[in-house]
């Protein structure tokens, strides 16, 4: 398939004294740092990360982490690699600073499977105009590259921050969240450090996202008793019992939709998959249902399942030979950061000064690892990154704007300089 070649949008390098809408002017240090962030270096690192693949499910993030680690080490960052499972390492890379609170960046190394139908090899990155194409370009190899090169520019400019700037890159974000769970577990009870804020570099099209819903996967198992369909009363039909539970779930979904949050919408249920029975002429002895529950900030999947199980008992669905069990196989909490938080104001201002125009403040329909940082460590969290979640992430011929990559890196650098600050001479 032939693509029309978009016209690249030049991003002028900001200079000292630049102001946007009355925002604070860029300092000489800020301008010097931003001038060291180049399009060529961002395209090169993003391309290398795309080529490393890391499809998941499959657990193949190791090569991506190796490429990322090599880039961080080449720039002199302190690094730590911890295997969550064989060949599946979390990476922590830090630009050291003083003892003041630092700034945390969060990303993930895995990508969803490429699938079929690509115009070119999904793991051989290519560029057409302003678009860099390849699986993970938007979600989220570009965001990772932008973080690394933002911190590298600060170091190259001989700026010492008052506190650390740290990148945590986890595995398995696209599936069960093994990486972020291992991180939060290993960090207890001391925590992960003193950070003024966390910036998740997922694709937001340079929008400042201050909250997102969480997500939970729930597996429902119903056990009954098989019998000949000519005498169904001799058996206990697991599919029939499961259908009654599904009716409870759908009723709760309707209840949730009646209470819409202006930023995030509402929690929701989705029945994603059903398996049950062994034959048309047999009473179904078993049924399994896979369920997705989108969580509002503060909701807990285990509490939700406990309430549903109580309804099942109240309706006597799990009686007379029917056994019902629920299992939460994955939970990712939602979060919300106040619109007046310092990281929000700083991100909006930095985006304008970095050449990205106005960054609107909004919510996010997807879930991400940032909810764990907010819930487990109480760190104010936003999502801000290059790429279009709705039209590029997880899509055939996924691509990202090179212009957005450059702007995102500049914003990340400005956030370090402004939220953490320079160390005293």
Task: Locate the predicted segments by residue.
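Ser/Thr/Pro-rich, intrinsically disordered low-complexity segments
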Residues: 6-15
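Acidic/histidine-rich catalytic neighborhood of metal-dependent amide-processing enzymes
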Residues: 140-217, 424-425
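Glycine/serine-rich anion-binding loops at beta->alpha junctions
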Residues: 113, 130-146, 228
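Metal-dependent amide/peptide-bond hydrolase catalytic core
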Residues: 2-3, 26-28, 83, 210, ...
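Acidic/His- and Gly-rich active-site-bordering loop/insert found
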Residues: 2-4, 20-135, 156-161, 378
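Acidic-glycine-rich active-site phosphate/pyrophosphate-binding loop
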Residues: 112-128, 195, 210-222, 349, ...
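Residue-level signal for inorganic ion chemistry
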Residues: 49, 53, 202, 242, ...
